[in-house]
Structures are given as C-alpha cells and as structure tokens.
From Swiss-Prot:
Swiss-Prot/TrEMBL catalytic activity: L-aspartate + 2-oxoglutarate = oxaloacetate + L-glutamate
Gene3D superfamilies the UniProt entry points to: Aspartate Aminotransferase, domain 1, Type I PLP-dependent aspartate aminotransferase-like (Major domain)
Gene giving rise to this polypeptide: aspC
Entry GO CC: cytoplasm
N6-(pyridoxal phosphate)lysine found at: 241
GO molecular function: L-aspartate:2-oxoglutarate aminotransferase activity; pyridoxal phosphate binding
Name of this protein: Aspartate aminotransferase
Subcellular location: Cytoplasm
Similarity comment text for this entry: Belongs to the class-I pyridoxal-phosphate-dependent aminotransferase family.
Lineage of source species: Archaea, Thermoproteota, Thermoprotei, Sulfolobales, Sulfolobaceae
Annotated keywords: Aminotransferase, Cytoplasm, Pyridoxal phosphate, Transferase
InterPro entries in the record: Aminotransferase_I/II_large, AspAT/PAT-like, NHTrfase_class1_PyrdxlP-BS, PyrdxlP-dep_Trfase, PyrdxlP-dep_Trfase_major, PyrdxlP-dep_Trfase_small
Broad EC category: transferase
Amino acid sequence: MSLDNFSKGALAISGETTLLYQDIARSVQKEKGIKIVNFGIGQPDFPTFQKIRDEAKKALDGGFTAYTSAYGIDELRAKIASFLSSKYNTNISSKEVIITPGAKVSLYLAFLLYVNPGDEVIIFDPSYYSYPEVVKMLGGKPVYVKMKWREDTGFSLNLNDLENKITDKTKMVVLNNPHNPTGMVFDPKEIDQLIEIAKSKNLIVLSDEIYDYFVYEGKMRSVLEDPDWKNFSIYVNGFSKTFSMTGWRLGYVVAKENVIKKMSEIAANVYTCPTSFAQKAAVSAFDTFDDVKKMIDTFKKRRDVMYSELKKIKGIQVNKSQGAFYMFPYLGEILRKSGMSTKDFSVNLIKEKGVVTIPGEVFPLDAGKEFVRLSFAVDENVIKEGVQRMSEFINQLMRS
C-alpha cells in the first residue's frame, strides 16, 4: 500500500485555484519589492464587529469551551430561525437549522446527503469553483448551464438551457444569489421560474445565499420566500460575509427537520460540532445590523469608484455590480489583440504591475474565459491605484 495511492474522490478534485494567484503575488512582492494591490480577496476587509468580539471574550472567560451538540447551540439555532422567519415571512423552527463550521461545510453536507456516484448536479457557468469540485469528489457529474451575457445588462440565468440539461440522472440545481463571480442579483422572476422548473422535475434547489446583505441594486429573492420551500430547497448561509467573520468559520443550513437530523448525524462523525465560543458570540451578531449597514454603504461607494475607474479603460466592457463585492469586466478585445488568455493576463498583471485579479475561466469552466474577477473589498484609494496600474498594463498590451 502506497501513501501516494489516493482515492478516486481525492484525485477528482483540485485545490482552491484562486490561491495560486495569491502565491504568485507573494513571490513578486518578495523578489521585486512591489506593493501588491489585491483585487483577488474574497472577504470583507472590516474587522469583526466589536460586540461580537466582546461576546467571544465573555464566552471564553466564562469557560464556554466544551463540545456542543452536533446541531449547534440551541440559542443560535433559535435566533436564526426567528430572524429568517421574520425576514422572509415564513415559519422556520429551530429544529430546521443546523450550525456548521462555515458555509462551505454546509454545502458539503448538502452534496454528501444527496449525491451518489453517477448523479448529475446542474451548476451555472460561471459560478463559484468549489461547487463542481465537491460533486466530482463524491462521484457525481457536474452539468454546466452557461449563463447568458449582454453588454448592457450583464449575466442572467439561462432557464431554457437548464430545462434542456435535465435528465433522469439530475438530482440537484445549485443557485448562488447574489452571485460570485459576476456580482449579479438575479431578477426575482428568474428565481421563481427556476423554482417552478425544479418543482416540476422533482429536483432539489441548493441555494447559497451567503452574500444576501450585499445588495446594491434590485431586489434579492430567497428560496425561503416560496411557501413550499421545505419540499424542494436547502438554504445555505453563514456569518463570514455579512458580519465579517471569515476566520471564525460559522455557517448554517435551513431545511426540513429530517434533512437537518441526517446532517447532524454526519456532522457528529466528521467534525463533532462547530466551535463553542464562536457560536455563542454569533448570537450577538444579529444585534449588529447598524454596523452591517455602515459596511454595506462603504462597499457600495467602493463599487461605484471601481466601476467609474474601469469605465475609463479602453477595451474593457463592465457592468456595475448589483451585489456581492465583485466586478467581472469583459476583456475580449484586449485578449484577442494580445493573444493572451485570462490566466495569462492575470499572471502577467501580477508580475508586471503587482495587481491581483482572478481569471474568469476558473469559475469553473469556460463561460468566464474572457472575463476577470476583481474584488472591491479594499480601500477606495487602493482601488484607484490598482485600476490605474491595470490601465497602464492594458495600454502597453494594446500598443504592442
């Protein structure tokens, strides 16, 4: 038996590809001493709000450091159930909530619960790159539905193609709204239509709503607003983005009670429980929405700055982000003239100008192959400097 003889599931997946570009940036900074402008960041740059930190200290000092239930602490489950019930005018019991060590674990539990080898999971392209990786690890098959893009309106869900891709092996559709990497907030009518398709075909909708408070334009539709949500959906969210708690690793799932019970059985055998004192602190997060609003207002200003700066660059087509904290400009003309792929573009931009962007072709197939993702989770002055460097780099490409 060789330690190099990995399982089929392990061999089916690759690492987090965005980290590659962070590694290149670190090397460039070390070798050339260039100040790095990091538009590759997928987390808010705000510290966790003071009240949450204070409650964590209080929990630690009070000795709240033992195991909890695999479901998570009752106080936090009840808080989430009450909050979402009020927000979406629905009825959620605390028994329909499980706390997890991050929204990624929530997604993993959902996939693990339903995906058998050979099952198909529909994933929109572009989308967050981890979705298909976990499906492949479990022996499932990601089936990609290419989103529609228009220069004037940006990306939208291709529901006709979605229907055409459904087979008797299709188990689930993955929805992310607001959307990473495109920054779209999908039209509520599109979401309603997707839900109706899923219901008619007896499919599960796995809805990743981690960016639900990062909405600058339009109205976000949650699956929990559908009166029949318990019969078709698994809702995933977490504390990382809204409350700037990425390192705390806390997420949660809302689903009908027997689904949550089965998830808790998996949890008990995989990670036992989420961190006790982090859960205790997270209860207070729901009292920090004044801080959340200030953060979102700041992000909206940053979005406006990045959009206006990118619009100045000849050859770029950019739609103003409606949600999340990403801009996803189209570089087709620049790439054709330079002979580069977006991966080439991103690597060379780091090496020559010290600016990190993430190539669209990693999200996760090819619908984003002429786009790059830029995060505006950085200071406005940093945005201006980074886009200026990017402009200089593009001008050099267009002249050569």
